[in-house]
Amino acid sequence: MTQQPFQLPHFYLPHPARLNPHLDEARAHSTTWAREMGMLEGSGVWEQSDLEAHDYGLLCAYTHPDCDGPALSLITDWYVWVFFFDDHFLEKYKRSQDRLAGKAHLDRLPLFMPLDDAAGMPEPRNPVEAGLADLWTRTVPAMSADWRRRFAVATEHLLNESMWELSNINEGRVANPVEYIEMRRKVGGAPWSAGLVEYATAEVPAAVAGTRPLRVLMETFSDAVHLRNDLFSYQREVEDEGELSNGVLVLETFFGCTTQEAADLVNDVLTSRLHQFEHTAFTEVPAVALEKGLTPLEVAAVGAYTKGLQDWQSGGHEWHMRSSRYMNKGERPLAGWQALTGPGTSAADVGALLADAVAQRARSYTYVPFQKVGPSVIPDIRMPYPLELSPALDGARRHLSEWCREMGILSEGVWDEDKLESCDLPLCAAGLDPDATQDQLDLASGWLAFGTYGDDYYPLVYGHRRDLAAARLTTTRLSDCMPLDGEPVPPPGNAMERSLIDLWVRTTAGMTPEERRPLKKAVDDMTEAWLWELSNQIQNRVPDPVDYLEMRRATFGSDLTLGLCRAGHGPAVPPEVYRSGPVRSLENAAIDYACLLNDVFSYQKEIEYEGEIHNAVLVVQNFFGVDYPAALGVVQDLMNQRMRQFEHVVAHELPVVYDDFQLSEEARTVMRGYVTDLQNWMAGILNWHRNVPRYKAEYLAGRTHGFLPDRIPAPPVPRSSPALTH
């Protein structure tokens, strides 16, 4: 290779890499095993020399340093299998663009991961099936049914990405920085690798496996693995192979900076993700363990798993430093007094740990709120879909005003009549569902009022008091206001509870308990996300862009409104269609577009008048160290990319989903209607932001911000209140 395009930056390495002493055993075993499975000579994919050059034994010995010999051999076999699968799929299906054969191949693989031991397996037809059958049989006896289910799903997702890659069109475009980080997470194998970390260390208890803190651990783990790889592989991928999916190239292109500056910035992002990992491990994981009532042994299991992910990070770095596959010479030198030598001193890099990393970590906590920023700048926002409004709009406005007064929303010191009118939530609802009847529009307006009021209430009432405990109590009680099957409902103690009980009864009257469940989860996710925002507010912690975007979808209440859209679809569309990658991609593109749109319009309101830190423009400013115009450019581009992604999924990916799931014409009609619903949703939200006073500079300048005079917010109601049956 030619001269390196940049010097490697100082890496944040708080944990030394360690090598498993059973390395040679794993190397020898994996070679024998691969030959027995038919992966080597005669496979048309690998020879033994290929396997030896890859040296997956060394990778696994570094990333799983503490497990015993048989466990390391099994884990190494899993990595041999997954890399062989990838190369096998490339040779057999990608090169020939044979979708039908590729899909048939993928459809059989779940048959070799039965959740029930008695289910049996078909006879393997190729080395991929033979390897999976053998590995599953050797692995699952030691693990619980919950782990089997999670690992089977993670494996299916990892394999199915090959199918979507085969179907997608390579647009030849360098991604937006925030979009890129999220994209790498989607196509990576982090949940799969994390499952094997559980096998090597300790299984995560089912009670917390699906919680946000454990998800964040896995996602920050994933981001750090991918960004580290981008730094080491830039020269090979970008200069030698012409690859566009590299984080250094993404930042270099988008910010117009030098390659060295982009590499340093990628390392800042990598360091931030590791800080997020540590922050979650030290603050959110203990809290959720306490909340879920984990036993000491279960807490120890979560700790061992967390340490296992840290070991994977350290070992993965050491692997990159030693592999001939990567650019790994010339890390930027330290000052003489800082340069330590000897075994294990990479983790004692004083410069990295006490200078750059500390300054970078502090950036998230040193933001000064209530800065004067002036009116929000509204850039060119692309909207290809026409606006339609429900003719029931005027009636909904009158009804919402009366309903809010009845519920007590206008008498708690957060909203008054003027503030409600400035929101004009029926205008938003009328655009979201232009075909709505009067009753439907009244109900939709009520849901928007509940969500918007709660979003204002939590930071104002609990944030100023720094009272996270009271906020958690409120969140728990709100969940209790949504019974699935006749459970007792607490007597309402404030306007939020009163309005939610009313909305729940009116919305779910004709639903079964199973139909109510996703709606309840959507509301729970939204109120839990308000707690996340509140926790950051109390700590004065500006989140990083990826974590922010993930949580913003929940705080915006998007799943709630989309769930109401889907509720009338009936059984024609199977649930797995909604869970498919393209449909989730479609929904997330629309959701992100709307959330970012809100942040652009609300920038002055939130930053200058409310001291808010949860705004995408501010998050990008803080994270990348750029000014308002540059950050606004990133957010504007991300919005427009999300719209293009939405259009791409509709045109190219949904037809493939319809065929893959063999949907009936009725189901296809329902899905086309759902796409129209999403188009109306985006057009209606843009129209609402453009026309309501809530975000306009002249309205903001004339308002009282904070608690309204003469109105006292209702205190939280004790948990022990007698219940009512509703």
UniProtKB/Swiss-Prot annotation:
Its EC number is 4.2.3.22, 4.2.3.75, 4.1.99.16. Keywords: Lyase, Magnesium, Metal-binding, Repeat. Magnesium. Fe(2+) or Cu(2+) ions are very less efficient as cofactors. Mg(2+) binds at D86, E91, N267, T271, Q276, D455, N598, S602, E606. Pathway: Secondary metabolite biosynthesis; geosmin biosynthesis; Sesquiterpene biosynthesis; germacradienol biosynthesis; germacradienol from farnesyl diphosphate: step 1/1; Sesquiterpene biosynthesis; germacrene D biosynthesis; germacrene D from farnesyl diphosphate: step 1/1. The keyword Lipoprotein does not apply. Residues 355-726 are annotated as: Geosmin synthase. It is an enzyme of class 4 (lyase). GO terms for molecular function: germacradienol synthase activity; germacrene-D synthase activity; metal ion binding. Its cofactor is Mg(2+). It catalyses: (2E,6E)-farnesyl diphosphate + H2O = (1E,4S,5E,7R)-germacra-1(10),5-dien-11-ol + diphosphate; (1E,4S,5E,7R)-germacra-1(10),5-dien-11-ol + H2O = (-)-geosmin + acetone; (2E,6E)-farnesyl diphosphate = (-)-germacrene D + diphosphate. The keyword Hydrolase does not apply. The earthy odorant geosmin is also responsible for the 'off-flavor' of contaminated drinking water, wines, and other foodstuffs. Belongs to the terpene synthase family. Tow-domain protein where the N-terminal domain catalyzes the cyclization of farnesyl diphosphate (FPP) to a 85:15 mixture of the sesquiterpene alcohol germacradienol and the sesquiterpene hydrocarbon germacrene D. The C-terminal domain partially converts the germacradienol formed into geosmin, the characteristic odoriferous ('earthy aroma') constituent of Streptomyces species. This is Germacradienol/geosmin synthase. It comes from Streptomyces coelicolor (strain ATCC BAA-471 / A3(2) / M145).
